[in-house]
Swiss-Prot record:
Assembly notes: Component of the ASTRA chromatin remodeling machinery complex.
Gene name of the encoded protein: ASA1
UniProt family annotation: Belongs to the WD repeat ASA1 family.
WD repeats mapped onto the chain: 17-68, 74-123
Domain of life of the native organism: Eukaryota
Lineage of the organism: Eukaryota, Fungi, Dikarya, Ascomycota, Saccharomycotina
Cellular compartments per GO CC: nucleus
Intracellular or extracellular location(s): Nucleus
Keywords: Chromatin regulator, Nucleus, Repeat, WD repeat
Record GO biological process: chromatin organization
Protein name listed in UniProt: ASTRA-associated protein 1
Cited function: Component of the ASTRA complex involved in chromatin remodeling.
């Protein structure tokens, strides 16, 4: 375990299981025995996935797996907890799907797994659905049902409440919407084509060819019936789903010609990244661009956003294998453009500490750098915690309700940064209060 601290972040641990490059990470929130002002708090665990289809569910307290299983026959593109979404630091739970995990692989399948069930939402009592064996040879899958999807491109799958958005079964330029209802999957919208919708609604002389956006690369929910979709062409579109038709709310072309590689919605803002070196921030309501930052590292392959003590942190992993965290501020005097009020301020650069004994490494001529391809970061994720979970108001709900948290319990409820690496390891960091 490392103890190095840098600018509000502390190295925590290195998790080892995967034999293939890590391809996806997801903080997975569990009920906890803690409350603040009578409200139950959630405890973060972690789900990691790799290019060989394996999933590991990690206990962040013990740094050991709660379960391991092979979920897909090839690379896992998406892992996402169902039944929860966050409004800043306030979690919204959905009873029908809380406790389920969605995985999406390049084997053309989306699978939904039952990991735990809440027996009482008033007391947040819960139990594991099935004991998951911890070794590869005896790994046994949790309960599951699945959806066949198009995996011709690397588009993710996104879920909110009981809704699931997937690439369309027949076209890479369209998407489908499913709902989980009574342990069944129903398709609500089929083959939604944004270019076709714009063509039907256009009042200009634009041709069909000018309306082609290319394959869908990224999709995320921005509201209960609203999505942001990123395309191969660099276009980002915000879509409002309605019962009889779909409305295009706004379109942004700040990334034009660079495929969209990441979309995150937070605090009435939509953050996007692409194969360029740009991070763009748009107003969720109007689509107005409020920030464009060139971070000078092309190919932003992973993007996430969290709020840490009222500070907006934006994390990225780039094609050079490094992970970086920026502080995003719309009230900064550093803004140089009145129209673009948001600025990105470098916060920290995450460096994985290599082992002391490194076989077959190559050093540069000046002996200042080490060429270690397996140390390249692939994906970064930031966890969330509820407002007030790191102060003395946090109590236990098991009869010792006035007991102030011990330091170890506070640590278990803190915010994390996770980085998945090319060699299959996952580094965990703690986002400090200061």
């Amino acid at each position: 375990m490392h103890t190095h601290t840098s600018h509000g972040i502390e190295s925590d641990a290195m998790l080892r299981f995967h034999k293939s490059p890590v391809s996806a990470l997801e903080p997975f929130y569990l009920p906890s025995p803690f409350v603040v002002n009578g409200e139950p708090l959630l405890l973060a665990s972690l789900v990691s996935a790799d290019e060989n289809g394996w999933v590991v569910w990690w206990d962040l307290g013990t740094k050991r797996p709660l379960g391991t299983w092979r979920a897909h026959e090839s690379t896992i593109v998406t892992v996402q907890q169902m039944g929860i979404h966050w409004d800043a630091d306030v979690p919204q739970l959905h009873r029908n799907t809380f406790g389920k995990l969605l995985t999406h692989g390049r084997d053309n399948c989306v699978r939904i797994w039952d990991l735990f069930r809440v027996s009482s939402f008033s007391s947040m009592d819960w139990n594991l659905c099935k004991v998951l064996h911890k070794t590869r040879d005896t790994a046994r899958n949790p309960d599951v049902y699945e959806i066949p999807v198009n995996a011709l491109n690397f588009c993710n799958v996104a879920t909110r409440a009981e809704m699931i958005a997937t690439p369309a079964s027949l076209s890479s330029e369209s998407f489908d919407i499913y709902v989980v209802s009574n342990h069944r999957l129903e398709r609500l919208h089929s083959n939604v084509d944004i270019c076709q919708i714009l063509q039907q609604n256009q009042r200009s002389n634009e041709t069909d060819e000018n309306r082609k956006f290319g394959a869908i690369m990224q999709i995320t929910w921005t509201g209960d019936f609203q999505l942001a979709v990123g395309y191969e062409s660099g276009i980002v579109a915000c879509i409002q789903l309605q019962e009889r038709h779909t409305q295009v709310v706004w379109i942004d072309s700040s990334h034009l010609t660079h495929p969209i590689l990441g979309i995150v919605s937070n605090l009435d803002r939509v953050f996007t990244c692409s194969a360029s070196d740009r991070i763009v921030v748009n107003s969720l309501q109007t689509g107005k661009t409020v920030a464009i930052s060139k971070i000078k590292h092309k190919g932003i392959s992973s993007l996430d956003v969290t709020i840490n003590n009222s500070i907006c942190l934006v994390s990225v992993t780039t094609w050079d294998g490094f992970s970086r965290i920026y502080r995003y501020d719309e009230d900064s005097s550093a803004a140089v453009d009145e129209a673009l009020k948001g600025v990105f301020i470098p916060w920290t650069k995450l460096r994985r500490i290599p082992p002391k004994v490194i076989p077959n490494f190559k050093s540069s001529s000046n002996h200042q750098t080490i060429d270690l391809p397996d140390l390249k970061g692939r994906v970064i994720k930031l966890s969330k915690t509820q407002n007030g979970c790191n102060n003395a108001l946090v109590e236990r709900s098991d009869g010792q309700s006035k007991m102030i948290l011990r330091s170890s319990e506070k640590r278990a409820l803190t915010r994390y940064a996770f980085v998945g690496y090319q060699d299959g390891r996952v580094a965990t960091y703690i986002l400090c209060d200061s």
